[in-house]
Structure formats: C-alpha cells, structure tokens
Amino acid sequence: MEQLFKELTFSNGVKAKNKFLLAPLTNMQSPDQGRISDDEFIWLTKRAEGGFGIIMTCAMPVLKSGIGWKGQLGIYDPKHEDGHYRLNERLHNLEALSIAQIFHAGIRADINYSGDKIGPSINSEKSAREMSIAEIEEMKLAFVECAIRAQQCNYDGIELHAAHG
C-alpha cells in the first residue's frame, strides 16, 4: 500500500508526487458553452487538495459537434483557454499534475449540438452516418489543435479518448 504514496516518474522525467490519479469523470458542471464553471473548478481542485498526484479532466470535445452531454467542459474553442490556465495554475500550486482528456462523442454525440451523429461506419442502431474523408481529416486536425491548446494552457499531459467511434 505504501507504494501508492511514493513518487511516480514518467519516462520523460515528469514526476507525480504519488500514484493517485483522478479518473476522467464527466459531471456536466460547465454549462456555459464549454467554459469551466466555478463548480467544476472547485470539484477538480478539491481532489488535488485531498492529495491526488494526478488530476485528469473529463472527456473534452475537440469540436463543438463532438459534445456528448449538456454541461460538458470544452477545449475546442479559444474562449475556453482562460479557464484552463486558471485550473492548471491552481492544480500546479497544489503540486498535482494535470492531464487533459480529449475526444469526440461520435455516435454518442448530442444532436442538439452536432446536428447528426457520425462514426467510422454506418451505425443504424445509433442513427449514425459514416464520416467522409474530409470529415476524418477535419477530426484529425481538431485533435492536433486541441492537444496543442492543452499544452499551451499548461496541461502536463494529454489522453486521447477514442471509445465512441
């Protein structure tokens, strides 16, 4: 058990103060078009105050069309950046690493935001259509842009969530 409390060093040299990681939990606390709310900010920072060495965000869509739930934290728009800077400043002051989980809801997207559901192939059960080559290229670019945005907002790492094809 004591191993959990020991420092964790990643292959790139980055160190976490312990091996406790907050898993990505979507709790729909950021209803203002993806901007981090005070509730979500407090919820995440309280975990760092409680001793977690690594805090991972909820799944954040890389495109507005990738929103899966109302109140989902976003990273797809520059207007989201201020909240991410503020969050990371606080997490780092609490000696916690921060990881941004980025995704697209795909066949589970909320059609109120996306207009339709897309996937790598037709999914009649989820009423999803097959993505075009152009949409695949747009998606790849969106993941790259959001990974760069996360890095610029001082996240220590990125996790790619790709379960909703």
Spans of model-derived segments:
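Active-site groove signature of glycoside hydrolases
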Residues: 151-165
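Generic hydrophobic/aromatic pocket-lining and core-packing "Φ" positions
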Residues: 44, 88, 147, 155-158
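A generic "cationic amphipathic patch" detector
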Residues: 35, 68, 111-113, 163
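Short glycine-enriched loops at secondary-structure junctions
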Residues: 58-61, 103-108, 161-165
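Non-globular sequence segments
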Residues: 97, 103-155
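N-terminal capping/small domains of soluble enzymes
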Residues: 1-103, 139
